[in-house]
């Protein structure tokens, strides 16, 4: 093989949701990229629940899409049941979710990966990193060594190992090494990384048993059909992209279920001390739910199809690591599951993760230059959180090679910015999940405007191709054109438009009113106004109509939030030099110095969000930084 086969700009380790987005982002910027995976057949595999999106998560998927990523496009091609969550609430918290066909999703991701220029895929497990130990400068990564001894060289490496680092599966008293069920763990790589100056701990996650859907009684369950009209996930998508649609179903556990679980808790690795890692707070096992909510007589279970051409279903809500005989008993005690056949047991998996406070906002490690971490190894849970980190890490890995400054969005620019800032500032002791409640400026960070927030930035950095840019530009132009058209129309009590509005909508126009002001009325929407003959039919693009309505209806709130952001940003981006000596700042307490030394914030905004940081300490820091700046100028 030629020397060029072993040399790349960026190497990505792992072909999951973080790894594929990292490799694609790197390659889109022009960096020669190698994606290493232990099994090409599992690139893009959905290891746990067959779904994309949800509260907070759908926002991340839209942001990935706005930056040219793959997840939303694959979801549109694989989504077999679609819902808009919080549809009756404000636009800030509305979220798109789809039930996905596992095989269709994996196929879509693999096709996107294989079609991407500058991206090479190679099947190999990685056992070690090649790291140059600096003397006068920091250590830096130079490449990787595979299980078979192949050495691939690159000045940037992105590690996206998911649950594979020293992964250990638990089913009752049985435990064994695995990355996930059916896949070997990355044991050697985990051991090598533990020799490096990284803070490493253990987390755990779990998955429910899978069931043969043909053995269930759907007659005692509640059907949950998808939405009509169907939403789409990608700004490039259309409803015709979706495959055939199916329903999900809802059932409940019973008192018998809970009794079976309580009687077997002594055999649960969660309660015997066998599992040391902390699990996700917002996706607890059925054992946890029965113990923590002892007063509840039932827990809801969503019966979700795994795909169109397979019989398996995913019983969302009964993640468990109890012994198999207990799993079988508890499953058959659920309404409609009396004759259920389990096709795969549920299990818990423990794995290594790195304290994310050891990362820069670019997701580059502070300890080793050119080495980036993304996904579950940073303490997060969920496909969407992993994919968003992967895109950011892949982009910055490429920019590192290209000699360009790293990029990371602020908290007021993207949920991705909230995610990264939370991780690198606060760290985490349990798997981190994104919610809209984590964002201070969520009215700005809506699903519908993710492209308006990020596509221009993505285009400037090489992430957005010509087709997406043309679609985005056309959409923005249409929004502006329609807003301008409506702003030129006025209704008065006596003119024709005023009479039409009153007649068609039953709305009284008591004074001269601009049509845009009519949209601001709580009882009116863009769609209802378009029923007025002089105003309609309006635009036929639902995304354009939505943008027009939201930008007008919430204009006052948005303006106030922008003012809040401007005030907050006054010192947010003031940089703190790398290697800054906090002991040199007179007046800082030892406690504050230790907090700052531990996190090593890159700017004042990050320093402000360190738990226990006081306004007085920030003021002292700002004064010191300003003095240092003036002395350099002088």
Swiss-Prot record:
UniProtKB keywords? Cytoplasm, FAD, Flavoprotein, NAD, tRNA processing
Keyword Flavoprotein set for record: yes
Q: Quick one: a GO biological-process term for this protein?
A: tRNA methylation
The record, for SUPFAM superfamilies, names: FAD/NAD(P)-binding domain
Which metal ions or organic cofactors does this protein require, according to UniProt? Answer: FAD
- Which residues make up the binding site for FAD? 14-19
Function field: NAD-binding protein involved in the addition of a carboxymethylaminomethyl (cmnm) group at the wobble position (U34) of certain tRNAs, forming tRNA-cmnm(5)s(2)U34.
What is the protein's name according to its record? tRNA uridine 5-carboxymethylaminomethyl modification enzyme MnmG
Its source organism is Xanthomonas euvesicatoria pv. vesicatoria (strain 85-10) (Xanthomonas campestris pv. vesicatoria)
